[in-house]
Amino acid sequence: MKPYFKKGVLLNFASGYNLTFHNVELPPDSDVVMAAPRMLGQGVREMFVSGEGYPAFVAVAQDASGKALEYAKALCKAIGATKKGVIEGNINDETYLDLMTELGVLPLVYKVFAEAFKLETEMGHPEEAVLMEAYFSKEMMFLWEQAAERGLFRQLCLHSHTAQYAQLKRFGEGDNSMIRNFLKEAYESIRSGEFDKEWQAEQTKYNLEHLDALREKALNTEVTKAEDRLKARLK
């Protein structure tokens, strides 16, 4: 891209990652902004086409023109983000929060589903029923949609009294130190630059060798094999 940089151009990043960790050399006489959709790429396209839109973070990394923020907001409007709301922040906010989801929150979610599948099938429950209850029915997707609309706990009004009591009682029980430590380790790996160093090496030195191995391992777990069997039966 560097040969195409000219004075006065606007350079936009859809993520703050490479800006936070200084992995790119910015053109000195140009506006550099971030319009970062809070949505997966496929969802960005589908929600743009449908007219629904999606939220986004917006920030300015470099303001050569004095109008960089206005340009960034206009870009957010053009891609459909203003229909759901644009939050102005700084580059590091987007990077840290995005990576915390990827390094901290989602791995815990995957662990919970995988362990629940293992335990429930060991207790003799049919694997197809376990998967359907967990997420194949898309009830969980509806739950999270309602959490986004109503609030994490306010969506509980849609559940039966039994479900409300069970969830709230267990939410207040147990020792959260393991979860806290897991999340804190993730945050420290971001703040120290340890994760970026590891990821840069994975891309340049190892040519994604470890990523390929991790994907292969995940796709050969018992839960993935059970998913394949259930999908074949549902066709």
Across the structure, where does each feature detected by a protein language model lie?
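A broad, structural surface signal
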Residues: 3, 114, 118, 181-188
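Rossmann-fold dinucleotide-binding core
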Residues: 12-100
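Residue-level marker of alpha-helix boundaries and capping positions
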Residues: 63, 107, 176-177
